[in-house]
Amino acid sequence: TIKTKDKDGQHMNNMDLGYEMFCYQCEQTANGKGCTKLGVCGKTPEIANLQDLLIFQIKGISCYGKVLQNEGHHIDKNIIRFIENVLFTTLTNVNFDSKVHVELLNESQRIKENLRTITGEIHNQTSYATYDLPETKTQMLKDAQFAGIMYDKSLDPDIRSLRQTILYGLKGISAYGHQARELGY
């Protein structure tokens, strides 16, 4: 399970705020503040939460990838392609198929475990790096509540916004990469 606690040692997550989901990725968000029960675009809480967990997982993969890069290794193009695909898949209105999301989550865990084997224990032992994905979708959805945008109530809103802006920029770049790959470039 993902361990995330506030300064008093209490767990925090999107659900603590009374949200089934939280998404403010697009201009369609409810009242311009974010969708919390169902996306205006049709995104369900299940998909939103699986997407949050996918992003959490690729952050973990990146912890190991950074170690390999620092040691002078090149990252396998299949891993880069996978991360690009996850970023593209989590864009608004791209893919709302929970089966695909669970398959991507399982693949993310295989990649992370493979990178762990290569790197051994790393210095950056964040919850992103140490988290192990459970086997069932039900448990994944329980864990996803700790991977959401609003999980850390103590995080400065400007820092949260900056992190999300960077993430959305990466998602946009991945869309171009994905389309170029589809066209054979």
PLM feature spans:
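Metallocofactor- and cofactor-centric catalytic cores in central/energy metabolism, strongly enriched
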Residues: 13-185
